[in-house]
């Protein structure tokens, strides 16, 4: 190659590198490849130092999970123990239909659970997917991490592994989750033989509240077998992230997955870098929402990467939203996103961001030495 051609090639390589760096930045300003600065002015999304534990759940169960996780951290315990405890509280709650016991099943009526856990101190991870009959998949995932050299176990293998450590098989259905699946099976198609015949569709069932076999709030939609409030389709999932007094970081993501999913479908939750990522030098991030989008964008890894480049957890979560929208809307301008991200860093900062007009402002429960609070993040790309 001539000297002139060599110079052109060199210039082309430099231009490509500049393009890649600009693309990763997504317009967020100059890219800084260094780790988080040792000192930064405290933001309004920062606890008074560490320890700190957060969850994407903002309901009463999420708050109880944070109370129990904080007891561990406040007593000098590890972030790893704290996130497992917090996740377990949510997993065993029969009223929570997004994870564990009482989660919504697949299309066959079988509840299949996914979970991942990551320990920043050892940079180790474990996960299970399509796990049946075990209420606390995050605890099984921890054993995969600590007692094997594997990262993920799936299906029957995951169940056999759990049984070998003494986990008891249990029916994961509650009356509410089973009724929701039976209703979906009856109503998901008008071309099969499930459900009441046309002439009985609005006739009240015996013992119901009189709204009709297929009537929900407002007279249309759904009702449960007991006439309770219906359980709507959802993506499920909760994240629990913590940093302890030694400034070690850990995280858990756990889910019952997409409601009525195809048997064996696995979302982002058990995939390290997608549904969960932890870097002990930086922080942690977790995702909820449409898992397929999160997998393709490696969203949790990307959030931690952005925090390592100097972004706050809030800014990094917003960057992940922008990344997904940028990729999808290049192909389909009508892309309708539905993701939520939460993140923390070692300095005690936290943030949350979501997108899609089917979500309100994203909320997360935060517990630190300052007490318990429910934080509202930002919502983007609602139209």
Language model regions located:
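N-terminal secretory signal peptides and thylakoid transit peptides that target proteins
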Residues: 3-27
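Alpha/propeptide regions of enzymes that mature by internal proteolysis
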Residues: 21-31, 42-383
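N-terminal signal peptide c-region/cleavage motif recognized by signal peptidases
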Residues: 34-36
